[in-house]
Amino acid sequence: MDGNTEDLQKFVPQVHFEQIPIKNLCSNQDYQRNLSIKHVQRAAANFDLYQINPVKVSRRDGINYVFNGQHTIEIVALVSGSRETPVWCMVYDDLVYTQEADIFANQMKYVKSLLPYEIFMANIEAGNDRELIIRDLVESYDLTITSSSRPGGICAVSTLINIYEKYGFHTLDRVLRLCVATWEGAPMSFSSNMLNAIARLDNAYGETMKDDTF
């Protein structure tokens, strides 16, 4: 290995990957958070094998301590019905307890969360029905779903999804129709507060609220 390659290795974690049965993993360290049974049950009910990440493990004194993936192993155990089930683990052999705790505490410090718009557009690319239906409905009014506020654009993506999920397609359709007819695509008319308010009005009053007198 030449000198340059050795220098580059400084930026590569010294780990190896193993499949380890869940029963051989320990996640009761004091720095660990409490296990959320509700989260485990919800994730298990919507289990997707391709969303399972490798579990990060510190091997100390022959014991496999989980410092990232506590809920993952419980989800897999619940879905598979066995703690004999193996999971892929990214194993560190050179950590001490305080390093594990520090990594656990700061693991999300520089992680950039996905924005609702980014999630929505990825679901479009994946061909997921809900997002395709919402996009087509929005575009039927000559509007677009956008990442920021602009004329004729809707950036309140989470609100569109929430209205669709809570009240249904026809309420979302009417909300958009009323906004377009009343404010003609003005950006503020598609704010989260405005969309939610009209959805609640429609839910409360239904057909007694006339479009032409809105």
Write out the residue ranges for each language-model feature.
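Short alpha-helix boundary/capping and kink motifs at helix termini
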Residues: M1-M90
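Solvent-exposed functional surfaces
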Residues: S82-F214
